[in-house]
């Protein structure tokens, strides 16, 4: 067992982590921002694409969610290879391939083609989010992890803030140019930057602190001391597969993700049904919930780190989201209360999401961390298929969104109860 190196007392830890934050977090945030945009811009494309191609609500909901089937199937292989291949090559490969696939969405003309392209997008993006968690766990100890996660995954709300107005502007101003519809231009313009980011990742990102030329040897030792020796509570991937608490976490995450992506994919359509007809106005309205989510994420991540508590900081927002979903279903077709409640729902869910991802790296240590985190994400992220698809199915069957919103209230409540039920310490298998 390798010894934990003593922390160099002369170093200013605050200054060191300020440098690490400045070097890594903005770049990772930008990468995840485009990942999020390429996942959910299909929700905005729906406003034109569904009419142009004649897709039903159910078919569109399945197509939006089928991304996650591809993601789930290839999640574990991608992350089990991550420690061997390295973050730089893994993230670079993911970015380039999903950028190409996202841009090629402009060629979709039928439901089967729509399903196929969304599936491939999931295959090529597989492993990115849990890979980020594993990568951050090599740089940040428990006392800083939730804030680092909040800073990177702030890309989700930022994507919601800028995604609506930017997508609306592209679809409105470029429609008809070069014979392409507005939704085709949107996929092209938002997909190509990922290819550039993938190349930049190969050149810029260090795989781990030991590979960072901009850190001194003392600084590298301090990071290792802060993170802790991975062998101290090492877990094998086989033991992770037998751990009941890992599956409780995974299904709790399933509920959070199903709720988040149900809102992400259907928010533009929900607001349009309330009478918002202008694409530009709709784009700005859809950004409002994500402004609140960004503030909530930063607040909850900082508070959770400061108090050293995860379970209640994750479960309470999820329970609040359940109540808010139910209230939203009761508002009927009224724009102002619907938008206000969906804003609070979005904020609560992203707060739960942020703190949730500080939990697995504290529980699963050592060589199995990448695979264990991927297992949780694999099971949980399948909620990204079922959430949007369920909204589409229920809306088609009931002729109304209200029963679908009540269903999501139930899903969020189950997630909160699962988080409440599990007590975790570092795994020692």
Feature-to-residue mapping (PLM):
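Glycine-rich segments within core transmembrane alpha-helices of 12-TM secondary carriers
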Residues: 147-171, 193-194, 377-387
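Conserved MFS/SLC helix-loop-helix module at the cytosolic interface between two early adjacent transmembrane helices
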Residues: 73-112
């Amino acid at each position: 067992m390798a010894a934990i190196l003593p922390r160099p007392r002369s170093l200013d830890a605050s200054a060191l982590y300020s440098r690490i934050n400045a070097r890594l977090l903005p770049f990772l945030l930008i990468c995840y921002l485009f990942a999020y945009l390429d996942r959910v811009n299909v929700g905005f494309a729906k406003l034109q694409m569904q009419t142009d191609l004649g897709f039903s609500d159910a078919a569109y909901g399945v197509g939006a969610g089928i991304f996650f089937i591809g993601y789930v199937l290839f999640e574990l292989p991608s992350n089990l290879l991550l420690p061997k291949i390295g973050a730089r090559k893994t993230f670079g490969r993911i970015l380039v391939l999903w950028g190409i696939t996202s841009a090629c969405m402009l060629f979709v003309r039928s439901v089967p083609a729509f399903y196929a392209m969304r599936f491939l997008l999931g295959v090529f993006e597989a492993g990115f989010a849990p890979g980020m968690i594993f990568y951050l766990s090599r740089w940040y100890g428990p006392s800083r992890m939730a804030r680092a996660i909040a800073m990177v995954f702030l890309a989700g709300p930022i994507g919601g803030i800028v995604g609506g107005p930017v997508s609306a502007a592209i679809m409105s101003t470029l429609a008809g140019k070069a014979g392409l519809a507005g939704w085709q231009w949107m996929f092209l313009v938002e997909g190509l930057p990922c290819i550039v980011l993938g190349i930049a990742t190969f050149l810029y990102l260090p795989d781990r602190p030991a590979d960072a030329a901009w850190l001194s040897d003392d600084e590298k030792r301090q990071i290792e001391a802060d993170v802790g020796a991975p062998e101290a509570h090492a877990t094998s991937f086989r033991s992770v597969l037998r751990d009941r608490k890992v599956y409780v976490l995974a299904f709790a995450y399933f509920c959070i993700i199903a709720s988040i992506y149900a809102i992400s994919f259907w928010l533009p359509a929900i607001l349009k049904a309330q009478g918002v007809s202008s694409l530009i106005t709709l784009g700005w309205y859809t950004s409002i919930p994500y402004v609140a989510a960004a503030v909530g994420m930063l607040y909850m991540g900082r508070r959770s780190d400061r108090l050293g508590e995860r379970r209640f900081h994750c479960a309470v927002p999820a329970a609040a989201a359940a109540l808010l979903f139910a209230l939203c279903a009761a508002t009927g077709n009224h724009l102002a209360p619907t938008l206000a409640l969906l804003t609070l729902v979005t904020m609560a869910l992203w707060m739960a999401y942020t703190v949730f991802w500080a939990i697995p790296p504290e529980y699963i240590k050592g060589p199995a961390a990448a695979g264990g985190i991927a297992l949780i994400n694999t099971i949980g992220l399948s909620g990204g298929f079922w959430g949007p698809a369920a909204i589409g199915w229920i809306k088609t069957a009931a002729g109304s969104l209200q029963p679908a919103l009540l269903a999501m209230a139930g899903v969020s409540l189950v997630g909160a109860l699962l988080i409440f039920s599990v007590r975790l310490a570092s795994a020692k298998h």
